[in-house]
A protein has these predicted regions:
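HIT superfamily nucleotide-processing domains
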Residues: 1-177
Length: 177
């Protein structure tokens, strides 16, 4: 049985590689489409670092806290073009982003959200979700992102807000909404 399972894995990997040959698979010594060795998001996914939620298709993690509740949602596979995502992954990417926004909304009650989809900074498809509050100095404008090399005062969720958010994420994981 183990031999059959290994054969199936190798065959699927091989077929995948022929279809999307891009990244070297360390285990099978051929091109592999799943994770890019130079991508910081792929490294976090591989190491299970800072992940708040994951399913078969996406991962969710906190972003840089220059805006309170900044969340990043991304596919588990490394893809640089939204139009090339597999239909199931795209569906999860879009629908689960909305669910994460709802969970965050119950925790911190923002007035609105700004969503950013940028291809020019980190070449792994992802949404930046910025909860926005009328009290923000730049409310009504796109989020101001501090220079990567400059320090900023982190805007973190309170313990109570985190607890509410995590409870909502657990409900999401359990398929309760």
């Amino acid at each position: 049985m183990e031999l059959l399972s290994k054969f199936k894995e190798d065959l699927l990997c091989s077929l995948d590689a022929k279809e999307k040959s891009r990244f070297k698979c360390v285990k099978h010594k051929h091109q592999h489409p799943h994770l890019h060795p130079e991508c910081k998001f792929c490294k976090n996914i591989k190491e299970k670092k800072d992940i708040l939620f994951e399913n078969d298709h996406i991962v969710v993690m906190f972003g840089r806290p220059h805006h309170k509740g900044h969340i990043v949602v991304m596919p588990k596979v490394h893809e640089e073009d939204l139009l090339k995502l597999h239909e199931k992954t795209l569906d999860s990417f879009l629908n689960d982003t909305v669910k994460v926004m709802k969970a965050l909304g119950k925790a911190i009650k923002p007035d609105l959200y700004n969503l950013e989809y940028l291809d020019n900074w980190d070449h792994h498809i992802h949404w930046n979700i910025y909860p926005r509050f009328k009290s923000d100095p730049d409310y009504g404008n796109p989020p101001v992102i501090p220079d990567k090399n400059k320090k900023f005062k982190p805007k973190l969720l309170s313990t109570q807000e985190k607890d509410i958010f995590y409870r909502q994420i657990k409900r999401m994981k359990a398929g309760l909404w």
